[in-house]
C-alpha cells in the first residue's frame, strides 16, 4: 500500500479524552473514531489489525478441532427467559421491542442461542463431543464506558461452546481450550496468564481468566513469578490426547495465579517471598465449565448408549478480539508510539523514501515495494512529499516492526537501512538482503 493513497488520519496532539496509552495511540494513529460513548468506527489501519487478530483466533480454533458458525447479534428474549437470565442480567443488557411488540435483545453473550441450536439438531451421544464457536459483535451497556476499546459498549468477541456427554469429556474440552488460548496469545506476542477467577453471571464452578499484566489493567492480580518464565513455544499438540492437554494445563496452573476475587492470602503466603508478585492485569479471555446449567432448563439432551436421555455438559470460552488491540498496545509501546508484534502488525514493513522525486531513490523504493510484495509481504510505502522527520514520526507512531529507509547517499553505495522498531537498531545492507531478512523473519511467524 502506498501511503499517499491510504486513509490514515493521524493526529499530532494527544486527544484530551484519552486516559490510557492504548486509547491515546489508537486515536492518534487513525485506527478508530468514536461515534458515541463506548462505540467506535474502525478505520482502515485499526480494522487491518483487527482482522489479523481475528485470523489467528480462527486458525487456532480450527487447529483444536472447533467448528465455526455465525449467530445473529439480535436474540429473542424468550430464550433468555428459558434459562432464567433475562431478568437476572441487569441493565447491561440492551433490550429491544420490534414492530410486532416482540421482546428482543442485543446479545451480550450466546449461551442460550447456541443451546437452542444444539437441541434442535443433536439428539444422540454419537454426535458428541461437539464444539462450536463464532466471532461476532456484542453489546453490553456499560454504565461508564472508558479506556477506548478496552471497555467499550460494543465489542468483537470470539465465543465458543462445547457439548459433551459427561464431566470427564467436558473437562477435556476445558483443557483443550486453555491450551488453544495459550498458543493463540503467544502468536500475538502476548504473555496472557491463566488465573483462577470468579464465574460472574455466566455461572459455573470452574473458570480461568487470561490476563495480560499492565499497570492500566482493571483487575488486581496475585501470582508466582515462576509463571512468567513459561513459554508455549512451537510445541505440536495432539488436542485429542487427554493426558497431553491435561499435562500442559497443569504446567500453566501449578504456579499460583489468581485475580483479587479468588485470591487466598494464606496460600499466597506459602510462596517464597522473592517470587510473590502483585500487579494489575487486563482480561483478554475466559474459559468456563458450567455443567448442565443451561442444558437442563432448556432441554438440551441426548440419548445415551443404554437408551436413557441425559442433559449434556457444557462450557463456554471467550476471547476479547477487539479488546486485544488495546491490550497489545498497553504491553508493547514506547513514548514514540505503538510497537506491533510481527504476528499482528497491519503491514510487515514500512518503506521510507528520504527524497521523493529523486529518480534513483524512487526506482529503489519501487523495486523494494515490488520485491517485498512478491515474497508475500505487505509493505507500506511512504511516498508522500514530506520531510524525513515527519515520515519517521508517522512510522514510529503506527508501530510497524520494521522500517526500510532509502536515500540518495545509501543508494549510491548500493545500501538501504533496515531498522527494528522495538530495539531501534539499524543495519545497512543491500535491498535484496533486506527483503531476504524480512521474508525469513515472517516465515517463522
From Swiss-Prot:
GO terms for cellular component: cytosol. One of its GO terms (molecular function) is ATP binding. PROSITE patterns: AA_TRNA_LIGASE_II (PS50862). The keyword Manganese does not apply. Gene3D superfamilies: Anticodon-binding domain (3.40.50.800), Bira Bifunctional Protein, Domain 2 (3.30.930.10). InterPro entries: aa-tRNA-synt_IIb, aa-tRNA-synth_II, aa-tRNA-synth_II/BPL/LPL, Anticodon-bd, Anticodon-bd_dom_sf, Pro-tRNA-ligase_IIa, Pro-tRNA_synthetase, Prolyl-tRNA_ligase_IIa_type2. Signal peptide: none annotated. Its EC number is 6.1.1.15. GO terms for biological process: prolyl-tRNA aminoacylation. It is an enzyme of class 6 (ligase). Its main location: cytoplasm. Keywords: Aminoacyl-tRNA synthetase, ATP-binding, Cytoplasm, Ligase, Nucleotide-binding, Protein biosynthesis. It is found in: Cytoplasm. It catalyses: tRNA(Pro) + L-proline + ATP = L-prolyl-tRNA(Pro) + AMP + diphosphate. SUPFAM superfamilies: Class II aaRS ABD-related, Class II aaRS and biotin synthetases. Homodimer. Catalyzes the attachment of proline to tRNA(Pro) in a two-step reaction: proline is first activated by ATP to form Pro-AMP and then transferred to the acceptor end of tRNA(Pro). Belongs to the class-II aminoacyl-tRNA synthetase family. ProS type 2 subfamily. This is Proline--tRNA ligase. It comes from Cereibacter sphaeroides (strain ATCC 17029 / ATH 2.4.9) (Rhodobacter sphaeroides). The gene is proS.
Amino acid at each position: 500500500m502506498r501511503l499517499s493513497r491510504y486513509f490514515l488520519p493521524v493526529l499530532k496532539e494527544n486527544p484530551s479524552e484519552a486516559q490510557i496509552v492504548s486509547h491515546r495511540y489508537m486515536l492518534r494513529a487513525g485506527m478508530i473514531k468514536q461515534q458515541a460513548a463506548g462505540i467506535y468506527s474502525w478505520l482502515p489501519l485499526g480494522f487491518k489489525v483487527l482482522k489479523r487478530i481475528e485470523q489467528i483466533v480462527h486458525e487456532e480454533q480450527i487447529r483444536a478441532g472447533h467448528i465455526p458458525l455465525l449467530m445473529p447479534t439480535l436474540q429473542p428474549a424468550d430464550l433468555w427467559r428459558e434459562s432464567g437470565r433475562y431478568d437476572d442480567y441487569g441493565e447491561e443488557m440492551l433490550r429491544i421491542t420490534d414492530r410486532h411488540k416482540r421482546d428482543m435483545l442485543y446479545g451480550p453473550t450466546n449461551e442460550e442461542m447456541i443451546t437452542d441450536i444444539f437441541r434442535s439438531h443433536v439428539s444422540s451421544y454419537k454426535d458428541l463431543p461437539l464444539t462450536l464457536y463464532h466471532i461476532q459483535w456484542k453489546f453490553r451497556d456499560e454504565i461508564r464506558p472508558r479506556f477506548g476499546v478496552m471497555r467499550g459498549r460494543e465489542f468483537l468477541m470470539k465465543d465458543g461452546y462445547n457439548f459433551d456427554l459427561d464431566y470427564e469429556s467436558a473437562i477435556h474440552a476445558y483443557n483443550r481450550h486453555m491450551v488453544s488460548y495459550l498458543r493463540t496469545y503467544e502468536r500475538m506476542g502476548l504473555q496472557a496468564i491463566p488465573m483462577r477467577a470468579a464465574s460472574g453471571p455466566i455461572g459455573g464452578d470452574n473458570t480461568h481468566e487470561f490476563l495480560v499484566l499492565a499497570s492500566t489493567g482493571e483487575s488486581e492480580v496475585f501470582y508466582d513469578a515462576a509463571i512468567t518464565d513459561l513459554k508455549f513455544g512451537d510445541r505440536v499438540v495432539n488436542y485429542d490426547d487427554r493426558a497431553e492437554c491435561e499435562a500442559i494445563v497443569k504446567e500453566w496452573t501449578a504456579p499460583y495465579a489468581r485475580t483479587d476475587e479468588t485470591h487466598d492470602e494464606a496460600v499466597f503466603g506459602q510462596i517464597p517471598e522473592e517470587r510473590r508478585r502483585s500487579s494489575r492485569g487486563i482480561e483478554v479471555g475466559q474459559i468456563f465449565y458450567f455443567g448442565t446449567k443451561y442444558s437442563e432448563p432448556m432441554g438440551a439432551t441426548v440419548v445415551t448408549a443404554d437408551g436413557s436421555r441425559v442433559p449434556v455438559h457444557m462450557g463456554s470460552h471467550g476471547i476479547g478480539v477487539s479488546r486485544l488491540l488495546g491490550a497489545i498496545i498497553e504491553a508493547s509501546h514506547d513514548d514514540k508510539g505503538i510497537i506491533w508484534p510481527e504476528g499482528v502488525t497491519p503491514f510487515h514493513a514500512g518503506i521510507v523514501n528520504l527524497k521523493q522525486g529523486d529518480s534513483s531513490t524512487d526506482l529503489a523504493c519501487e523495486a523494494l515495494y515490488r520485491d517485498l510484495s512478491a515474497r508475500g509481504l505487505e509493505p507500506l510505502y511512504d511516498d508522500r512529499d514530506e520531510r524525513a522527520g515527519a515520515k519517521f514520526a508517522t512510522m514510529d507512531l503506527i508501530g510497524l516492526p520494521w522500517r526500510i529507509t532509502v536515500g540518495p547517499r545509501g543508494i549510491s553505495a548500493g545500501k538501504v537501512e533496515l531498522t527494528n522498531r522495538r530495539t531501534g537498531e539499524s543495519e545497512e545492507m543491500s535491498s535484496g538482503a533486506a527483503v531476504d531478512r524480512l521474508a525469513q523473519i515472517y516465515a517463522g511467524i
